[in-house]
Amino acid sequence: MAQFTSDGLALAYDEFGPADGRKAIVLVHGFSSNRYENWKRMGWYDAIAGKGLRGFALDCRGHGESAKPHDPARYDREAMAKDVFTLMDHAGVERAHLLGFSMGAHIALTAAMNDGGRIDHLVVAGVGGKIFEPGREPDSMAKAMEAASPDEIGDPMLKSFRHFADEQKEDRLALAACSRGPRSTLTRDALLAIRRPTLVIAGARDQLAGPPQGLADAIPGAKAVVIPGCDHFSMIAHGLFKASVFDFFDGWLE
């Protein structure tokens, strides 16, 4: 495990693939997950290295082996987006592809709106048209993380996130703080600022994301791919997810 410091927090990351790779890529995982579970275990490290790319995957603040403050103010979405660029600075990388899943997709979109010039291709997965719809009660995810037992959680989606957090042995109070962190609403007008080649991917059965085309339509020139038969979680390991990403990088989906 390697570390870098961002905003006073020690954040863990992995580097993989050839150090002199033709291009770099940064991977940003989803809520309650970590770099190992979201990417390495699902075969992404090997796939990226096999494509000759220099890869980086970080544990977002509050997750995995990174620092886990319990103060919601430390999870400002803008700050979490800056963590991506701080990792790139630490590694001496000026530009990179950026791939984010679920929460990581929100972070990647924020990064692209703030400093898109450092991003080559942008891929956001596990998100779709529902990004523009009112979500669950704002504090519901935090309360699910704070519940004494998953049995106290009525909402099936929230319960699944809680079970996953328990399986990963994550710090549930840090996750609760993360879910309460300040963030700007992603609007269609705001997304017009993204001027990088963008791909939106979601599973056909992803009830959390909704159809990816609904988000792609809001980003100039963006493409959308639906992974058949997959829900929010099962698409991560699907071969078509990987194939779509690499085809996009190689220009086949342009």
Residue ranges and their predicted role:
Residues H29, A96, G100-S102:
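Conserved alpha/beta-hydrolase "nucleophile elbow" surrounding the catalytic nucleophile
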Residues L9-A67:
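Conserved HGGG/HGGXW glycine-rich cap/lid loop of the alpha/beta-hydrolase fold
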Residues H106-P150:
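Flexible "cap/lid" loop of the alpha/beta hydrolase fold
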Residues E78-A96:
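Conserved acidic catalytic loop of the alpha/beta-hydrolase fold
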Residues R162-T187:
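Hydrophobic, aromatic-rich cap/lid helix
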Residues P228-E254:
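Catalytic active-site module of serine/aspartate enzymes centered on a nucleophile-bearing elbow/loop
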Residues I194, V200-A202:
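Short beta-strand/loop motif that positions the catalytic acidic residue
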Residues Q207-P212:
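Conserved alpha/beta-hydrolase "acid-adjacent" motif
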